[in-house]
Amino acid sequence: MAAEARVSRWYFGGLASCGAACCTHPLDLLKVHLQTQQEVKLRMTGMALRVVRTDGILALYSGLSASLCRQMTYSLTRFAIYETVRDRVAKGSQGPLPFHEKVLLGSVSGLAGGFVGTPADLVNVRMQNDVKLPQGQRRNYAHALDGLYRVAREEGLRRLFSGATMASSRGALVTVGQLSCYDQAKQLVLSTGYLSDNIFTHFVASFIAGGCATFLCQPLDVLKTRLMNSKGEYQGVFHCAVETAKLGPLAFYKGLVPAGIRLIPHTVLTFVFLEQLRKNFGIKVPS
């Protein structure tokens, strides 16, 4: 009798990403604060101390509902497309996809996920940035759904997709860095014969993937955050890039350290959770 393997269900990526987001949300919030500074005034530790001192420890979880909403749109979409297509194509070809096909599939999945997740991403950035604004300038969204409703009512439906081009481009890059590079790294690690398909292998492969994703998407991440948090002062992506460049070339990598500190653990946790979901609750298929 043939041994049985398991493949992920289409929604496992969204669930795993939500679990990871709950663990890394404070780092994501600090990253947004650092990126939206007009001048480099505070580093990561200083920003964390200021947030806690001003609004309390729970302020580090400001916007968590929007972050979870984003994961259940953006991450669920890209994981569902990538894993469903990859598993079906690989099943027909009797072997893993070549790396260039993984990159292409990751790009398409990320573009779709980035577009679908733009409204939740917009609200997520605003809710995280709210705690550093003066009381009179805060938007004070009660939760993610309230934020989505108020943006649509007060600013129009088009505003919900402000920065969609940038979010989709960033989604493509981070998905290539995470999903495509994770698959390839895991394949290479297993091919050495020194490690089996266990949690340590998942950790090593996802750590590599997190580093790749951070390197690829940081410049776009800075521009996306500035566009979404703007009040109309930028005419588009190019104008935002020009204005950011005036602050110096390193402005595109503002918040790089907290971005890496946040994205690498987030990537590791996402894939560890995903692999455990697949192993214990995945769909059984003949191996």
UniProtKB/Swiss-Prot annotation:
GO biological process: dicarboxylic acid transport; gluconeogenesis; glyceraldehyde-3-phosphate biosynthetic process; lipid transport; malate transmembrane transport; monoatomic ion transport; oxaloacetate transport; phosphate ion transmembrane transport
One Pfam family cited in the UniProt record for this chain: Mito_carr
Solcar repeat intervals: 8-88, 101-188, 197-280
Tissue distribution of the protein: Present in high amounts in liver and kidney, and at lower levels in all the other tissues analyzed.
Localization annotation: Mitochondrion inner membrane
Residue spans crossing the bilayer: 10-30, 63-82, 103-123, 163-182, 203-223, 255-275
Chief place of localization: mitochondrion
Keywords: Antiport, Disease variant, Lipid transport, Membrane, Mitochondrion, Mitochondrion inner membrane, Primary mitochondrial disease, Repeat, Transmembrane, Transmembrane helix, Transport
One GO term describing the cellular component: nucleus
Topology class, membrane: Multi-pass membrane protein
GO MF annotation terms: antiporter activity; dicarboxylic acid transmembrane transporter activity; malate transmembrane transporter activity; oxaloacetate transmembrane transporter activity; succinate transmembrane transporter activity; sulfate transmembrane transporter activity; thiosulfate transmembrane transporter activity
Catalytic reaction(s) noted: (S)-malate(in) + phosphate(out) = (S)-malate(out) + phosphate(in); malonate(out) + (S)-malate(in) = malonate(in) + (S)-malate(out); (S)-malate(in) + succinate(out) = (S)-malate(out) + succinate(in); (S)-malate(in) + sulfate(out) = (S)-malate(out) + sulfate(in)
Source organism superkingdom: Eukaryota
PANTHER family recorded: MITOCHONDRIAL DICARBOXYLATE CARRIER-RELATED
Job description of the protein: Catalyzes the electroneutral exchange or flux of physiologically important metabolites such as dicarboxylates (malonate, malate, succinate), inorganic sulfur-containing anions, and phosphate, across mitochondrial inner membrane. Plays an important role in gluconeogenesis, fatty acid metabolism, urea synthesis, and sulfur metabolism, particularly in liver, by supplying the substrates for the different metabolic processes. Regulates fatty acid release from adipocytes, and contributes to systemic insulin sensitivity.
Implicated disorder: Mitochondrial DNA depletion syndrome 19: An autosomal recessive mitochondrial disorder characterized by progressive and severe epileptic encephalopathy, hypotonia, poor spontaneous movements evolving to spastic quadriparesis and dyskinesias, and respiratory complex I deficiency and mitochondrial DNA depletion in skeletal muscle.
Protein name: Mitochondrial dicarboxylate carrier
Originating species: Homo sapiens
Source lineage: Eukaryota, Metazoa, Chordata, Craniata, Vertebrata
